């Protein structure tokens, strides 16, 4: 027995080592440990104990968490484990190795014993350091939109919040930090105690519980004082809001009055500007008319001077024309008299010419008659021969 204990390959020490390895993990790599098990090849990570979970989470909300499961004492019962710890293999009723010979019922029994128990995920209330079940690792993370649709998002207070600053003042915080007892999630019932819990802390649990109750009463009193102060502040705030509302209404009334006065003054100023513009336009038109009239007056004076000169010249020309007219009238009367005399003389000459023409025609007719008589006598004489 002592020799077996010293070798570390079996006996009590071997059983202790096997139990320790089964609970807290072994030095065997997962690839070697589960090499011959086809049903476990799709698993990427393994959990050796409730306190030894590992899982990778991403920031992506759509990434699904890998379901981790608890291992038990039947995990890793393969030929390698039997050879390492010098364990006897399992035999069936016929005396053969049930795993090697392929006994279906034995394999199912071993598989059911080796398969870990399922863990039901739940929503973690807080980040507990002693939560050995790792529930928060199996919880599906919800997106911000899902949280906003289901409930109002929690907004933490700022560091400079007056209520929190008064409730948790600097002295009180330092006192809590210096105290040996600190209220944490380890004191919540239903959780496993931390392995690092000191013995004196466990012994002084009731004393610390009384201190915590006393501090809780102090906190309640401080809360009630703060609530009373908040009530007074709310009343002061309501009064202040009422004053602000009245001042705002007065400001709006004054603004409306000023606006109306401004509109009236602006309309009056616009009318005055229009009148001034009309007056300036009339003054400008009168000035232009005055200049044009003055120019016309100057032209009229010059024209009157020219007219007087022209009148004198016309008078002189009129006298000359009158004299010429008299001269021409005299000449015309002389010419008319001369024309009358010439006409009378012409009539007398015409009468003389007509009488001469009549005499000549008479002589011509007589000569023609004589010629006719002579020619007739000669014709008669020629016919008689």
From Swiss-Prot:
Chain intervals with Basic and acidic residues compositional bias: 34-48
Disordered: annotated span: 34-76
Keyword annotations from UniProtKB, A to Z: Coiled coil, Cytoplasm, Cytoskeleton, Phosphoprotein
UniProt free text on domains: The C-ter coiled-coil domain is sufficient for localization and homodimerization.
Top-rank lineage group of the source organism: Eukaryota
InterPro entries named among the record's database cross-references: Bbp1_C (IPR029330), Bbp1_N (IPR029328)
Similarity comment: family membership: Belongs to the BBP1 family.
Coiled coil location: 229-355
GO molecular function, one term: structural molecule activity
Subcellular location: Cytoplasm, Cytoskeleton, Microtubule organizing center, Spindle pole body
This protein's name: Spindle pole component BBP1
Main location: cytoplasm
Complexes and interactors: Homodimer. Interacts with KAR1, MPS2 and SPC29.
Additional information: Present with 922 molecules/cell in log phase SD medium.
PTM-bearing positions, type Phosphoserine: 29, 73, 115
């Amino acid at each position: 027995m002592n020799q077996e204990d010293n070798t570390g390959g079996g006996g009590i020490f071997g059983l202790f080592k096997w139990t320790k390895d089964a609970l807290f993990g072994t030095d065997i790599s997962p690839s070697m440990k589960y090499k011959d098990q086809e049903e476990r090849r799709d698993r990427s990570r393994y959990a050796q104990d409730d306190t030894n979970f590992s899982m990778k989470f991403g920031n992506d909300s759509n990434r699904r968490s890998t379901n981790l499961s608890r291992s038990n004492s039947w995990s890793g019962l393969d030929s390698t484990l039997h050879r390492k710890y010098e364990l006897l293999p399992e035999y069936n009723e016929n005396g053969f190795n049930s795993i090697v010979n392929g006994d279906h019922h034995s394999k199912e029994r071993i598989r059911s014993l080796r398969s870990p128990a399922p863990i039901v995920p739940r929503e973690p209330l807080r980040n507990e350091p002693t939560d050995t079940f790792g529930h928060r690792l199996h919880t599906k993370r919800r997106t911000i939109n899902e949280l906003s649709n289901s409930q109002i998002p929690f907004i933490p207070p700022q560091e400079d919040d007056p209520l929190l600053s008064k409730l948790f003042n600097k002295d009180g915080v330092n006192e809590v930090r210096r105290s040996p007892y600190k209220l944490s999630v380890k004191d919540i019932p239903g959780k496993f105690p931390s392995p690092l819990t000191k013995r004196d802390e466990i012994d002084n649990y009731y004393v610390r519980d009384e201190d915590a109750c006393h501090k809780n009463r102090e906190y309640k009193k401080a809360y009630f004082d703060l609530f009373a102060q908040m009530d007074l502040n709310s009343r002061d705030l309501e009064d202040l809001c009422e004053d602000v509302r009245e001042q705002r209404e007065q400001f709006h009334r004054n603004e409306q009055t000023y606006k109306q006065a401004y509109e009236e003054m602006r309309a009056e100023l616009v009318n005055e500007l229009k009148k001034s513009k009309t007056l300036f336009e009339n003054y400008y038109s009168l000035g232009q008319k005055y200049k044009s009239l003055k120019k016309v007056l100057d032209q009229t004076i010059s024209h009157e001077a020219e007219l007087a000169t022209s009148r004198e010249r016309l008078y002189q020309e009129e006298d000359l024309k009158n004299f010429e007219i008299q001269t021409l009238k005299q000449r015309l009367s002389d010419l008319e008299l001369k024309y009358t005399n010439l006409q009378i003389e012409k009539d007398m000459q015409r009468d003389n010419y007509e009488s001469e023409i009549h005499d000549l025609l008479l002589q011509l007719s007589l000569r023609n008659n004589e010629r006719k008589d002579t020619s007739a006598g000669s014709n008669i004489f020629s016919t008689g021969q």
